[in-house]
């Protein structure tokens, strides 16, 4: 984030972390504002060889600890410095 390019920190949990291969990363935004849905597509494309799209499609997403509704993914825009989390479905027993 220090190079002046807007970026976000993305956290991956559970199966998303396993698929992506690490628990977090910083991603530069190509433009701002940048739709959250476009960030998800960018990540899916970056890790397409690992089958990321299938896992990311099932995730809930949060931005700065606010859960984003599925129908808001296109409307929700990122401007840089946000913390975005990919949260796969969980179950208990």
Swiss-Prot record:
Keyword terms: Cytoplasm, Molybdenum cofactor biosynthesis, Nucleotide-binding, Phosphoprotein
Q: Which residues carry this modification: 1-thioglycine?
A: 93
**InterPro entries attached here?**
Beta-grasp_dom_sf (IPR012675), MOCS2A (IPR044672), MOCS2A_euk (IPR028887), Mopterin_synth/thiamin_S_b (IPR016155)
Q: Do the record's keywords include Phosphoprotein?
A: yes
Look up keyword Cytoplasm and say if it applies: yes
Transmembrane intervals: none
Q: What positions are modified (Glycyl adenylate)?
A: 93
CC terms in the record's Gene Ontology section: molybdopterin adenylyltransferase complex; molybdopterin synthase complex
Location, primary (coarse class)? cytoplasm
Cite a single GO MF annotation.
Answer: molybdopterin synthase activity
Which cell locations does it reside in? Cytoplasm
The pathway is: Cofactor biosynthesis; molybdopterin biosynthesis
The family annotation for this protein states: Belongs to the MoaD family. MOCS2A subfamily.
**How would you summarize the oligomeric state and partners of this protein?**
Heterotetramer; composed of 2 small (MOCS2A) and 2 large (MOCS2B) subunits.
Task: Tell me the protein's name.
Answer: Molybdopterin synthase sulfur carrier subunit
- The organism of origin for this protein: Mycosarcoma maydis (Corn smut fungus)
């Amino acid at each position: 984030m220090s190079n002046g390019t807007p970026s976000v920190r993305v956290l991956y949990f559970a199966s998303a972390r396993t698929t992506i291969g690490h628990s977090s990363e910083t991603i530069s935004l190509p433009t701002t504002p940048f739709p959250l849905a476009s960030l998800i597509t960018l990540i899916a494309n970056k890790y397409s060889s690992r089958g990321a799209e299938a896992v990311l499609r099932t995730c809930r997403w949060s931005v700065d600890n606010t859960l984003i509704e599925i129908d808001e993914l296109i409307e929700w825009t990122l401007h840089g410095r946000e913390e975005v989390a990919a949260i796969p479905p969980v179950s208990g027993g």
